Amino acid sequence: MPDEFSQCLVTNSRMAARAITRRYDGYLRPFGLTATQLSLLGGLRELAGATVSEIADNRGFDRTTLTRNLDRLEAMGLVISTHPAHGNGRIAEITEKGDALIEQLLPLWRKAQADMKNELSRDAFDQSLNVLKRLAKV
């Protein structure tokens, strides 16, 4: 009887996510960032003025992971946090230093993307990305 769990979408998606994250983390390690943190910085750049909850929803982070990484980025001077004048929550914004780091890392991120495309093939990369985007909406 074949191992039914080897066909488990959860198991395989987690294994793939960890492998891809390790690959991207390797590119970013010399800069003291992780792929998760770079993704978060990119989200802050795109969603200027958004609350932590909005960022979590947009980027697929759970609040604990998001808060932990925001705190680290804030300690590095890449992010500042404020509280809105009205209502609850926390607003995180990218600093000039954080924005400059993104600009510095974009060529490296593009290289990581290109390396993955070359390893998978452009078609497989594009198909994988489309499937992942669909799965994120399940």
Sequence positions of predicted segments:
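A short, mixed-charge helix-start or loop-turn motif at secondary-structure junctions
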Residues: 2-7, 114
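Alpha-helical initiation/capping and key positions within long helical/coiled-coil segments
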Residues: 8, 12, 58, 65, ...
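Charged, amphipathic alpha-helical coiled-coil/dimerization segments
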Residues: 21, 71-130
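A short beta-strand-loop micro-motif that forms or neighbors metal/cofactor-
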Residues: 49, 124-138
